[in-house]
From Swiss-Prot:
Alphabetical list of Pfam families matching this protein: TIM
Listed name of the protein: Triosephosphate isomerase
Localization per record: Cytoplasm
Reactions mediated catalytically: D-glyceraldehyde 3-phosphate = dihydroxyacetone phosphate
Family: Belongs to the triosephosphate isomerase family.
Superkingdom of origin: Bacteria
Gene: tpiA
Role according to the record: Involved in the gluconeogenesis. Catalyzes stereospecifically the conversion of dihydroxyacetone phosphate (DHAP) to D-glyceraldehyde-3-phosphate (G3P).
Length: 274
């Protein structure tokens, strides 16, 4: 672990600057989930960091490794344009919570942002909206950016309940944040994650526009306009461009396709910048 964090501070724009700058920036985050050993991560980053594709200042790239790789990845990306994310956090700062990791711990090792409420956390580990609200607040208070993940199941989508589900997830999940908080939203329809099914760009745009309107009602029009809203769900190089062309899509949350540096770079290369 570094003893002098100032000497390893990334020489790139801060999160606050990125989230308050022009809205044309696109964010592309790769969620590794429960994958990669240390050796595999080192191999990935060696080829990934050296790519010229990452030189576009309008595209903000982040990787989200498992907890065991965060420190090593932080050292590897500290002098690169790549930001570091965590897959979840506990809502408490410390305590008798065996197996958990807190937001201050993540911030201490250089994590920039943290996923809150990924669909696998919601549906496999039964994380509920009120707890996710506490986790989002914990991330903010520790100096990280929460990426609140929301989405509906296939049954909910087919019954026409998508907007009701998302409204509840947004209203509760963001309820503990300060009025001027900076956060990122990720819409990931559960039926599209890891299934090969991709939401049609028209549906994605409609849903993202609804989310932005909801953020405006919960916070302000200004915050809604500057909040990046990402799409996640079977994102690949052959659909990344069409998704990024949606006016209210500000980036992509990539799952399995981000495990290969070649595939992930191909996706980033397809991102459309106005």
């Amino acid at each position: 672990m570094f003893t002098d964090k100032e000497t390893h501070r990334k020489p790139f724009p801060t999160w606050a600057h990125l989230l308050h700058s022009e809205p044309s920036k696109q964010f592309v985050f790769g969620n590794w989930k429960m994958n990669k050993t240390l050796t595999e991560a080192q191999t990935f980053l060696k080829s990934f960091i050296s790519s010229d594709i990452l030189s576009n200042p309008q595209i903000i790239t982040g990787i989200i490794p498992p907890f065991t790789l965060l420190s090593a990845c932080q050292q590897a990306v500290s002098d690169s344009p790549i930001f570091l994310g965590a897959q979840t956090t506990h809502e408490a700062d410390s305590g008798a919570f065996t197996g958990e990791i807190s937001a201050p711990m993540l911030k201490d090792i250089g994590v920039d942002f943290v996923l809150i409420g990924h669909s696998e956390r919601r549906h496999i580990f039964h994380e509920q909206n009120p707890v996710l609200a506490e986790k989002a607040a914990a991330a903010i208070h520790s100096g990280m950016i929460p990426v609140l993940c929301i989405g509906e199941t296939l049954e909910e989508q087919e019954s026409g309940a998508t907007q009701d589900i998302l409204l509840n997830q947004l209203t509760t999940g963001l309820s503990k944040l300060p009025e001027q908080a900076s956060f990122i939203l990720a819409y990931e329809p559960v039926w599209a994650i890891g299934t090969g099914k991709v939401a049609h760009p028209d549906l994605v745009q409609e849903t993202h526009a609804f989310c932005r309107k909801t953020i405006a009602s919960l916070f302000s029009k200004d915050i809604a306009e500057r909040t990046p809203i990402l799409y996640g769900g079977s994102v690949k190089a052959d659909n990344a461009r069409s998704l990024s062309l949606c006016p209210d899509v500000n980036g992509l949350l990539v799952g399995g396709a981000s495990l290969s540096s070649e595939n992930f770079l191909s996706i980033i290369q397809q991102i459309d910048i106005p």
